[in-house]
Curated annotation (Swiss-Prot):
A Pfam family it matches: BROMI
InterPro entries given in the database record: BROMI_C, BROMI_M, BROMI_N, PHAF1/BROMI, Rab-GAP_TBC_sf
Primary subcellular site in the record, as a coarse category: cytoplasm
Region Disordered, residue ranges: 131-160
Boundaries of every Rab-GAP TBC domain copy: 1119-1242
Gene source species: Homo sapiens (Human)
Keyword Phosphoprotein set for record: no
Keyword Oxidoreductase: no
Protein's name according to its UniProt entry: Protein broad-minded
Biased amino acid composition, Basic and acidic residues: 134-152
Gene Ontology biological process terms from the UniProt entry: determination of left/right symmetry; embryonic digit morphogenesis; heart development; kidney development; lens development in camera-type eye; non-motile cilium assembly; protein localization to cilium; retinal pigment epithelium development
SUPFAM superfamilies (alphabetical): Ypt/Rab-GAP domain of gyp1p (SSF47923)
Description of how the protein assembles with itself and partners: Interacts with CDK20, which promotes CDK20 stability and function. Interacts with FAM149B1; may play a role in cilium assembly.
C-alpha cells in the first residue's frame, strides 16, 4: 500500500482542486492562515454538501475497503459479548470498536499511505501553479507590455500560502482572455484563452467586473465556424451549469437561449424544411442539437434549486425559454416547405416534454409559467393544439395500409440518424400531447381554454381537446400486437394518449372537469357502439385501441364521480331512454364473453380485450348501486361459463416433453390460459364486494375456487392494484358472512392459516418486534402485536359461518397439551383460549414461574382479568345501555384501581343489577286516542293506511314513550289485523294452521332455542313484563311457530348444516313479540299468524323465510337470507351515499357494514338498545314498512359516526361495534332524518324487497 500510481495522484489532484474551488469563498475570507485551517478542519460541521464532495467520497470508500471487514468483525465480537451477559449501550460499543480500530496495524498502514500520497499531490499542485504563473506572465509581457505591471499585481496577503494563491483569478486575467477570444486572434491563442477560462473557478469568473462582456462574447462565439472552438464554448457553458451558482448559470442560460432565438430568426443560417427532414450526422445539425440539448438538460435540472433564489432569476429563465419556443418563421402556404421551428428540435431531444413536467410540478415556477403563457406566449399552447389537430386529420385521411411517420418508433429498433418530415411531425405531436396533458392537470392551465386556432372556425374548448385525444386512440395506427419489446409501445399514439388520460383521471378536480362529461364518455364508447351494430369501430381501430379505451373507462369507473356518470349519465333525473355508459359496457362485455361478436374471433388478443372490459364492469358491479344497474345482464353467469370453459382447457394442456420443439409454445399457451383463468376467478370474486353480489357468486358454484384463489394470493403476499376498490381482506370478510363462505374458507386453508398465525403471535411473539427497548407492563387485554391477527379472525366469525364450523363438535378437553401442539381450527382456539375448564389448559398458557403464583391470590388484577370479568358480566346480563351495569375495561389510577367485585360464581353480585324502574301503565293520551280512532275507520284502504302512519309518526316525534305497554299491543294488533283484511297489502298467501297442543307436545327445541328462552324470561322478569310460567308459554309459542313455518318450507338436500332442519339460531323476534304481548301466548301466536302474511314479516322475522317455498330454489340453496342480500345491501348503498366517512372507515378497517347490521337485525337489537327502543324499532317497521329497517340502521351509523371514526384509528372497530351498546340512540330522535331517507329511496327499496320471491337474476 505504500506505492501509488501516477493515475491515483492525478485523480486525487483533480478531486482536491474541485474541493478547494467549492470552499474557496470560505477560506479566502479567513483573516489568517490559522483560521483558514480551522475552517477546513470543521468543514463537515459547517458545509451541508460536505459528504457530496468527490474527495470525501474517495476517502470514505478507501476507509471502507481497508478497514470495513475488520470493523464488522469487531462489531460481531461486541454483539456476542452482549449476548453473553455483558450489558453495554450503543455508544459504548462504538467507543470500543473505534479504539480497537485505531490501534490496529491496518489503520496505521492506511494513514501512512494517505499521508504520503497527499504530500505528493500537494507538492505537485504547488509546482504546477508556479509553472502556470510563470507562463502566464511571459505571455502577458509579449501581448500587452503596457499593462504588464497591472497583470503582475498580487492583491493577496503575504501571509497567504501558495496553495491559496493558485485559485486567485484576477480582473486583469479576464480582460486578457476577452482580448484573446477576439475572432481576429490566431486560432492557438483563442484556444488557449478558452482553455484557461474553462479551468478557472466559476465563482472567480463571475466576480470579475467584465463577466457580462465575457458572456456576450461567448454568445457571439457560439456562431464560430470552427467546430472545435464552438464545442469548447459549449463545454464551458456545460461546466458553468454544473458548478456555478444560479445567478451565473442564469446568465449563461439566457445568453444561450437568445443566441438560439437569433440563430433561428437569421436568414443566413441554413435551417432545414419539414420536407427535407433532419440529418443528425450533418455537422451543422449536430452542433445545433448539442446546443439545444444543453439548454434542455439545464431546463430539467433548474427546478431542483431555483426556489432558493430570487424569483426574478427564475422568471428570466422561463421567459427566455418560452420566447425561444414560440419563434415562428414566415411560413410558406405549403406545409412541406415549412422551415423547422425551435420546438421541433426540442421535441427531438425531449420527446415527452419532461422539462415542462418539471417546471409545472412546483407552485413556485408553475405560477410564472402559466402567467407568461396567458399574457405573452399563448401561441405555444395554440401551436401544440394545432399539431394534435393536424395529426388527427392525417390519421383520418390516410389509408390504413400506409406506413406512418412513427413506424420507426414502433418497428425499427436500430438507431435512427435521419428523420423524415412525417417523423418530425409525429415527434412534435408527442411533445405537444405531453405538454398539453401536463397543462390540463392544473386549474390555471385549464383556464387558458377556449383557444382560437388559425384556419378553424370557432374556439377549441377543453371538452373539444379531450374528444380529440380520445378519437386519436382509435383513429391512429398502433404498433404490432403487444408482443414486441415493452419500449416499442411507449411512443405509439394510442399509448401516449392513454397515458395522458390516465394522469388526468388520477387528479380528481381535473378529471371532473375534463373526463367526467357525457360527450367524452360517448366518444370513448363510439367504437363499441359500432362493433355492437356489426360495423368496424373505426378505419384503424384495433384490439389494442379497445384495450386502451377499457383502461381509461376502468380508471373513470374506479372513482365515485366517474362511476355515477357511467351509471346515470350527466343528468340523473333525465327522462331520456338512451342507454348510459354502464349499460353499453355491460352489453359489450357480455357479447365478448358469449363470443357473440365475430369481428375479433380467433384473435390472440381477444382474451386481453375481454379481460379489459370485464375489469371495467368489475369496478361497477363491485358497488351496490352499480350492481343494481348491471344485475339484469347476468354477467356472473357469463363469467362463470367462461371460467368453466377455460378451466377445462387448462386441464387438457399436454405436459411438455423435454427436448421437444413444442415445449416453449405449450408453456406459453398454458401460461396464457392459466392467467385468463385467474382473471376470470378474480372477476367472479369481486361480486362478493356487495351482499347481493355474494348471492350471485354462490349461485355460480365457484365460491370454493374463488376463496382458494384469494388464499393463494394471501399466501404469496401479493399486493392489490391501487385502482381496485377492495383489498382481498375486505372480500374475505364479506365471504365469511355466509354459511357457504365459511365452509369455503375452511376448505381453502384460510382459517387454519389465520389461527396458526394468531397462535404464533400469542405464544412466541412477532419476529420483527424491536428488542432494544424492554416491553412495558401489560395493561391491555391483548398485545398490540397480536391485535391484527386477532381482528383478522374476528372478521370471519359471523354467526352463519361459525355455526357451520363448530356445530356438532365437542371440545377436545385433553388431559395434557404439549408445547408443540398448535391449534388449527376454531374449536381448538375455543378450547385453548376461551373455555379454560381444566388445570391442563391453564398451565399450557403460562410459563412455569407464572403458574406457581396462582394459589397465592384469589385473583390477579391485570388487563386480562379485568377484560374477563367484563365479558362474564356481559354474558350473564341481558339489556340495553341503561338496563345493565357493566364493569369498566380499564384499571383506575387510584389506591383502589379496581373496586368492582369479580364475577366467578353465581349469583351475580348485586352491584351489576340496574335499579331501573318501569311505569306500571301510561295514562291515556289524546294523540293515542286519535291513532286508535284511525284504526277503526277504514273506508278507503290507502287513505286509512296513510292516516295511521301520519298519526304514528306524529306520536313518535312528540311523545315516543306513550307507544309502549298495553297501548303498543293494541296498536300492533289492530293495525296488522286491518292490513291482513286487505288482499293488496298481503304479500304471502294465507296458510291454514290446525295443529293442536298435542301435536307439538313431543317436539323438542334446539339447545340454542332453550338457552334463548331462559335469557328472554330472565330479561322479561327484570323488566317486570313476564311472570312465573313464562318459560313454558314461550316454549309453546316457539313450538307452534316452528310447526306453522314448516308447512311453508320446501325440501332441500344440502351439505350446509344450517339448511338441515329448523332455523339455526334463536328466534329473537318471537321472543320480542312475546314480551311485547306481556307473556300472553295466545295473543302472541295469533299476531304472528296474521303478521306472517305481510312483506314486513320477511325482514323482521328471520325464521319466516328459512328454506321457504316462497323463495327461488337457488336462493334457498345458497343459505343466504333476504335480510342479507336485500336489506343490508341497501344499507351499504345508502351508507356510501349518506355517510361517506363512515363507509370509508369500514373499508379501511376491513370490516363490512352488512355483517354488523345482520347481527343487529337477527337479534332484534337485543343488548344493543333498551327495551323501549326495541319496541319502537319493531313498531316503526310494522307501521311504516320494511324499508324502515334500512333507515334505522343508517340512523344508528349516523349516531355512531364519531365513535366509528375514532375506533377506526385505534384499529378496533370490529370489537367496538360487536360488543358496545348503542349509547344514547333513540329511534324517535331520528324520525325526521328517516323520513328524508324514505322520500329519496323508498321506491327503489320496496320494489326490490317485493321481488325477493322472484330474485332469480
Amino acid at each position: 500500500m505504500a506505492h501509488f500510481s501516477s493515475e491515483d495522484q492525478a485523480m486525487l489532484q483533480a478531486m482536491l482542486r474541485r474541493l478547494f474551488q467549492s470552499v474557496k469563498e470560505k477560506i479566502t475570507g479567513a483573516p489568517s492562515l490559522e483560521c483558514a485551517e480551522e475552517i477546513l478542519l470543521h468543514l463537515e460541521e459547517t458545509d451541508e454538501n460536505f459528504h457530496n464532495y468527490e474527495f470525501v467520497k474517495y476517502l470514505r470508500q478507501h476507509i471502507g475497503n481497508t478497514l470495513g471487514s475488520m470493523i464488522e468483525e469487531e462489531m460481531e465480537k461486541c454483539t456476542s459479548d452482549r449476548n453473553q451477559g455483558e450489558e453495554c449501550g450503543y455508544d459504548t460499543v462504538v467507543q470500543q470498536v473505534t479504539k480497537r480500530t485505531q490501534e490496529s496495524k491496518e489503520y496505521k498502514e492506511m494513514m501512512h499511505y494517505l499521508k504520503n500520497i497527499m504530500i505528493a499531490v500537494v507538492e505537485s499542485m504547488i509546482n504546477k501553479f508556479e509553472e502556470d504563473e510563470t507562463r502566464n506572465q511571459e505571455r502577458q509581457k509579449k501581448i500587452q507590455k503596457e499593462k504588464s505591471h497591472s497583470y503582475r499585481t498580487d492583491n493577496c496577503s503575504d501571509s497567504d500560502s501558495s496553495l491559496n494563491q493558485s485559485y486567485k483569478f484576477c480582473q486583469g486575467k479576464l480582460q486578457l482572455i476577452l482580448d484573446q477570444l477576439d475572432p481576429g486572434q490566431p486560432k492557438e491563442v483563442r484556444y488557449e484563452a478558452l482553455q484557461t477560462l474553462c479551468s478557472a473557478p466559476p465563482s472567480d469568473v463571475l466576480n470579475c467586473e467584465n463577466w457580462t462582456t465575457l458572456c456576450e462574447k461567448l454568445t457571439v462565439s457560439l456562431s464560430d465556424p470552427d467546430p472545435v472552438f464552438s464545442d469548447r464554448i459549449l463545454k464551458f457553458c456545460a461546466q458553468t451549469f454544473l458548478l456555478s451558482p444560479l445567478h451565473m448559470t442564469k446568465e449563461i442560460y439566457t445568453s444561450l437561449a437568445k443566441y438560439l432565438e437569433s440563430y433561428f430568426l437569421s436568414r443566413e443560417n441554413h435551417i432545414p424544411t419539414l420536407s427535407a427532414g433532419v440529418d443528425i450526422t450533418n455537422p451543422n445539425m449536430t452542433r445545433l442539437l448539442k446546443k439545444v440539448r444543453l439548454l434542455n438538460e439545464y431546463q430539467k435540472e433548474a427546478p431542483s434549486f431555483w426556489i432558493r433564489h430570487p424569483e426574478k432569476y427564475m422568471e428570466e429563465i422561463v421567459e427566455s425559454t418560452l420566447s425561444l419556443l414560440t419563434v415562428k418563421h414566415n411560413q410558406s402556404h405549403v406545409v412541406s416547405q415549412k422551415i423547422l421551428d425551435p420546438i421541433y428540435f426540442f421535441a427531438l431531444v425531449d420527446t415527452k416534454a419532461v422539462w415542462f413536467k418539471k417546471w409545472m410540478h412546483a407552485h413556485y415556477s408553475r405560477t410564472t409559467v402559466l402567467r407568461l403563457l396567458e399574457t405573452k406566449y399563448k401561441s405555444l399552447v395554440t401551436t401544440a393544439i394545432q399539431q394534435c389537430v393536424q395529426y388527427f386529420e392525417m390519421c383520418k385521411t390516410r389509408k390504413a395500409d400506409e406506413t406512418l411517420g412513427h413506424s420507426k418508433h414502433c418497428r425499427n429498433k436500430q438507431k435512427t440518424f435521419y428523420y423524415l418530415g412525417q417523423e418530425l411531425q409525429y415527434i412534435y405531436f408527442i411533445h405537444s400531447l405531453c405538454l398539453l396533458g401536463r397543462l390540463l392537470i392544473y386549474k390555471q392551465g385549464r383556464k387558458l381554454f377556449p383557444i382560437k386556432l388559425k384556419n378553424k372556425k370557432g374556439l377549441v374548448s377543453l371538452i373539444d381537446l379531450l374528444v380529440l385525444f380520445t378519437q386519436l386512440i382509435y383513429y391512429s395506427p398502433s404498433c404490432p400486437k403487444m408482443t414486441s419489446a415493452a419500449h416499442s409501445e411507449n411512443y405509439s399514439p394510442a399509448s401516449m394518449v392513454t397515458e395522458v388520460l390516465w394522469i388526468l383521471s388520477d387528479q380528481k378536480e381535473c378529471a371532473v372537469e375534463c373526463l367526467y362529461n357525457n360527450i367524452v364518455i360517448e366518444t370513448l364508447l363510439q367504437p363499441i357502439h359500432n362493433l355492437m351494430k356489426g360495423n368496424e369501430a373505426s378505419p384503424n381501430c384495433s384490439e389494442t385501441a379497445l384495450i386502451h379505451i377499457a383502461g381509461i373507462l376502468a380508471r373513470i369507473a374506479s372513482v365515485e364521480e366517474g362511476l355515477i356518470l357511467l351509471l346515470y349519465g350527466a343528468n340523473m333525473n333525465s327522462s331520456e331512454e338512451s342507454p348510459t355508459g354502464a349499460h353499453i359496457i355491460a352489453q359489450f362485455s357480455k357479447k365478448l364473453l358469449d363470443e357473440d361478436i365475430s369481428i375479433f374471433s380467433g384473435s390472440e388478443m381477444l382474451p386481453v380485450v375481454k379481460g379489459a372490459f370485464i375489469s371495467v364492469c368489475r369496478h361497477i358491479y363491485s358497488t351496490c348501486e352499480g350492481l343494481q344497474v348491471l344485475i339484469t345482464y347476468n354477467l356472473h353467469e357469463s363469467i362463470a361459463k367462461a371460467w368453466k370453459k377455460t378451466s377445462l382447457l387448462s386441464e387438457r394442456i399436454p405436459t411438455p416433453v423435454e427436448g421437444s420443439d413444442s415445449v416453449s409454445s405449450v408453456s406459453q399457451e398454458s401460461q396464457n390460459i392459466m392467467a385468463w383463468e385467474d382473471n376470470l376467478l378474480d372477476d367472479l370474486l369481486h361480486f362478493a364486494a356487495t351482499p347481493k353480489g355474494l348471492l350471485l357468486l354462490q349461485r355460480t358454484g365457484a365460491i370454493n375456487e374463488c376463496v382458494t384463489f384469494i388464499f393463494n394470493r394471501y399466501a404469496k403476499k401479493l399486493q392489490v392494484s391501487r385502482h381496485k376498490k377492495f383489498g382481498y381482506g375486505v372480500l374475505v370478510t364479506r365471504v365469511a358472512s355466509t354459511a357457504a363462505g365459511g365452509i369455503a374458507l375452511k376448505k381453502s386453508g384460510f382459517i387454519n392459516e389465520l389461527i396458526t398465525e394468531l397462535w404464533s403471535n400469542l405464544e412466541y411473539g412477532r419476529d420483527d418486534v424491536r428488542v432494544t427497548h424492554p416491553r412495558t407492563t401489560p395493561v391491555d387485554p391483548i398485545d398490540r402485536s397480536c391485535q391484527k391477527s386477532f381482528l383478522a379472525l374476528v372478521n370471519l366469525l359471523s354467526y352463519p359461518a361459525i355455526y357451520e364450523l363448530v356445530r356438532n363438535q365437542d371440545l377436545p378437553n385433553k388431559t395434557e397439551y404439549s408445547l408443540r401442539e398448535v391449534p388449527t381450527c376454531v374449536i381448538d382456539i375455543i378450547d385453548r383460549l376461551i373455555i379454560l375448564n381444566s388445570e391442563a389448559k391453564i398451565r399450557s398458557l403460562f410459563n412455569y414461574e407464572q403458574s406457581h403464583i396462582f394459589g397465592l391470590r384469589d385473583f390477579i388484577i391485570d388487563g386480562l382479568s379485568v377484560e374477563r370479568n367484563h365479558v362474564l358480566v356481559r354474558i350473564n346480563l341481558v339489556g340495553g345501555p341503561l338496563e345493565r351495569i357493566l364493569p369498566p375495561r380499564l384499571l383506575e389510577k387510584s389506591d383502589n384501581p379496581y373496586p368492582w367485585p369479580m364475577f366467578s360464581s353465581y349469583p351475580l353480585p348485586n352491584c351489576y343489577l340496574s335499579d331501573i324502574t318501569r311505569n306500571a301503565g301510561i295514562k291515556q293520551d289524546n294523540d293515542l286516542d286519535k291513532l286508535l280512532l284511525c284504526l277503526k275507520i277504514s273506508d278507503k284502504q290507502t287513505e286509512w293506511i296513510e292516516n295511521c302512519q301520519r298519526q304514528f309518526c306524529k306520536m313518535m316525534k312528540a311523545k315516543p314513550d306513550i307507544i309502549s305497554g298495553e297501548a303498543l299491543i293494541e296498536l300492533l294488533e289492530k293495525f296488522v289485523l286491518h292490513l291482513t283484511e286487505s288482499p293488496s297489502e298481503c304479500y304471502f298467501p294465507s296458510v291454514e294452521y290446525t295443529a293442536t297442543d298435542a301435536n307439538v307436545k313431543n317436539e323438542s327445541l334446539s339447545s340454542v332455542q332453550q338457552l334463548g328462552i331462559k335469557m328472554t324470561v330472565r330479561y322479561g322478569k327484570f323488566l317486570s313484563l313476564l311472570k312465573d310460567g313464562a318459560e313454558n308459554d314461550l316454549t309453546w309459542v316457539l313450538k307452534h311457530c316452528e310447526r306453522f313455518l314448516k308447512q311453508q318450507q320446501t325440501s332441500i338436500k344440502s351439505s350446509l348444516l344450517c339448511l338441515q332442519g329448523n332455523y339455526a339460531g334463536h328466534d329473537w323476534f318471537v321472543s320480542s313479540l312475546f314480551m311485547i304481548m306481556l307473556g300472553d301466548k295466545e295473543k302472541t301466536f295469533q299476531f304472528l299468524h296474521q303478521f306472517s302474511r305481510l312483506l314486513t314479516s320477511a325482514f323482521l322475522w328471520l325464521p319466516r323465510l328459512h328454506i321457504s317455498s316462497y323463495l327461488p330454489n337457488d336462493t334457498v340453496e345458497s343459505g343466504i337470507h333476504p335480510v342479507y342480500f336485500c336489506s343490508t345491501h341497501y344499507i351499504e348503498m345508502l351508507l356510501k351515499a349518506e355517510l361517506p366517512l363512515v363507509f370509508s372507515a369500514f373499508h379501511m378497517s376491513g370490516f363490512a357494514p352488512s355483517q354488523i347490521c345482520l347481527q343487529w337485525i337477527t337479534q332484534c337489537f337485543w343488548n344493543y338498545l333498551d327495551w323501549i327502543e326495541i319496541c319502537h324499532y319493531i313498531a316503526t317497521c310494522v307501521f311504516l314498512g320494511p324499508d324502515y329497517q334500512v333507515y334505522i340502521c343508517i340512523a344508528v351509523f349516523k349516531h355512531l359516526q364519531q365513535d366509528i371514526l375514532q375506533h377506526t384509528q385505534t384499529q378496533d372497530l370490529q370489537v367496538f361495534l360487536k360488543e358496545e351498546a348503542l349509547h344514547g340512540f333513540r329511534v324517535s330522535d331520528y324520525f325526521e332524518y328517516m323520513e328524508i331517507l324514505e322520500q329519496n329511496y323508498r321506491t327503489v327499496l320496496l320494489r326490490d324487497m317485493r321481488n325477493i320471491r322472484l330474485q332469480s337474476t
